[in-house]
Amino acid sequence: MSQSTQAHSVSDPLFPIQSFKLGFTTCHTAPAIPHLSTVPLDDAALGIHKNTGKLKHDVVRPPPPIRPAPHPEPERAWEARYFQGSCSPKTEIPGGLGFYLAGPKDLAKALEGGAKEAVFSYRMMLDKDWEWVKGGKLPGMYGGIGDLAYRCSGGRLYERCKCFNLRLMWRPGGQGEVYAYTPLNDTNKKVLLAIPPGGQTNSDYGISTGRGAWNFEPGVWTTVAERVKLNEIGEANGEVQLWINGACVIHARGLILREDETSHIKGMHFQTFFGGHTSDWASPKDQYAWFADVSGVVIR
């Protein structure tokens, strides 16, 4: 890979880091920066695979926000449709969207080659009349050993030491959190539950991390950026960091995200739905969300 180059500062919340080796963005207004390539919002260009069932992610022109964004508004976005009564993709009425995103070939190759630290980011906007119900999932980073990295969610217990999944969630009233699936050990549990303003274990499911550290707002563009730093084998020095609109809201240090050198950052689990998996989580009406300006960089 190329040598590090100065990147965006926090003034551009898609890239809240000081330098990177290699990166991409689908943001059409991103400035020309060495080693940052612009790619279309397209399945082939972004290495999209394992699309969930019949769920679509059509590229559309999103509606205008209820107030201007501090950045140029995206002209193209994936549209997620949450049908009335929909919740988990495994239920009778599926909703949202779901797939895995590896990024362009050069970035995917760098990740599979053993990159230790990366950031993935996107902008999202919820319907202006959004109803939260009990909560739902939003895209986040994932990784692990080979195909064991997939489906590191849904209450999975087997081979949990060989994967991690760091999707986000919204909760009642728009409270945000990282819904963390990590190797099952006391070190990770202690770190994740200590992130302010508070955490919660969810039986065999993920750990709610930093619930209420920020609030989503319907009808406006929100920029999400997530950083994963893998731990050295045998050390508890992994990190997960999250920025919302350029502000760091969660920074978990001292994690064990892997126990084997072959466990890698894979990209993004680009999934969103209402749930939970029971009807009390379901969307009360047809609702929509839009996802745009998908980006990713390898730091080292």
Residue ranges and their predicted role:
Residues 1-222, 226-300:
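Low-complexity, Ser/Thr/Pro/Gly-rich disordered linker/stalk regions
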